[in-house]
Amino acid sequence: FECSISCEIEKKGESCKPKKCKGGWKCKFNMCVKV
């Protein structure tokens, strides 16, 4: 399982490649949500 976003890694302390939330999205509650 790959972390879907950077904050997921920070929260769980896992080592994996982050897929950051991009334009129009923000990180909230460990998920990408529309801004």
From Swiss-Prot:
Compartments (UniProt record): Secreted
Signal sequence region: none
Predominant localisation class: secreted
PROSITE patterns: HWTX_2
Keywords: Disulfide bond, Neurotoxin, Postsynaptic neurotoxin, Secreted, Toxin
Coiled-coil annotated residue ranges, if any: none
Disulfide bonds: C3-C16, C7-C27, C21-C32
Superkingdom per UniProt: Eukaryota
InterPro entries: Hwtx-2-like
Keyword presence, Metal-binding: no
Function: Blocks neuromuscular transmission. Acts cooperatively to potentiate the activity of huwentoxin-I. Paralyzes locusts and kills mice following intracerebroventricular injection.
Name under which the protein is recorded: U1-theraphotoxin-Hs1f
Upper classification of the organism: Eukaryota, Metazoa, Ecdysozoa, Arthropoda, Chelicerata
